[in-house]
A protein has these predicted regions:
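Active-site core of metal-dependent hydrolases
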Residues: 1-85, 102
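A short, hydrophobic/aromatic-rich structural module that often spans a beta strand
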Residues: 127-130, 185-192
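His/Asp/Glu-enriched, well-ordered alpha-helical/loop segment
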Residues: 60-142
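Short gly/ser/thr-rich secondary-structure transition/capping motifs
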Residues: 2-3, 119-122, 147
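Short secondary-structure transition/capping segments
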Residues: 22, 43-54, 73, 96-102, ...
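Short loop/turn and capping residues at structural boundaries
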Residues: 1, 24, 51, 76, ...
Length: 192
């Protein structure tokens, strides 16, 4: 996709057999669907759908993975930082797109961005809420004024969630996000 770069087709992707097929939906120029299908059906590696890629192809990859019962292969990316800059809402945008247009439940799309990505990238101490894992949490809710009946329904309708708080290593790092609409409900820290 970058000026001066060479084409990498399905044959090369399958021969290299990298852990993750990064930019499976291009960046923004995607391979033809026949080659995407070949990568998905002949390969067994993780399939990274990126925010800066071809959205139609991202939905095609998601559908192929669903048909094959291989949603555990889907991970999300933003291509950030890159020539297109930092994408502060990239992951939220791509998971909202997959949930609202791709026919997967929002909670499954959140798993693509968290548990699947942590497992594939071997981040063993994060990606899921479990004793012994890092306490890195994003508290979110339906955005004020957005359509839907709660967070998941709102995301299913294509609305970005409102971020109310971010906790890293068990410590509050920030409250309301400056990049998302305000959350309907905001967490409260109770000290005992």
């Amino acid at each position: 996709s970058l000026p001066g770069s060479g084409r990498i087709g399905a044959d090369v992707v399958l021969e290299v057999d990298a852990d993750i097929v990064a930019h499976v939906n291009g960046g923004p120029t995607a391979l033809p669907e026949a080659e995407i299908r070949q990568i998905c059906e002949k390969g067994s590696r993780a399939l990274e759908i990126v925010h800066n890629g071809n959205l139609r192809t991202g939905l095609f990859v998601l559908d192929l993975a669903r048909q094959r019962g291989e949603l555990s292969r889907i991970v999300l990316g933003t291509d950030s930082p890159a020539g297109s800059g930092v994408q502060p809402l990239g992951i939220l945008r791509i998971l909202t797109m997959l949930a609202s247009l791709g026919g997967v439940a929002p909670e499954v799309a959140f798993c693509f961005a968290s548990g699947n990505t942590a497992r594939v990238r071997k981040l063993h101490d994060r990606g899921m809420i479990e004793v012994g894992r890092a306490a890195d949490l994003i508290f979110m809710d339906q955005a004020i004024g957005g359509a839907g009946d709660g967070l998941l329904d709102s995301v299913a309708q294509g609305n970005l969630p409102g971020i109310g708080m971010v906790v890293i290593d068990g410590l509050v790092q920030t409250r309301r996000s400056r990049n998302t609409p305000p959350a309907m409900r905001v967490p409260e820290v109770i000290q005992g």
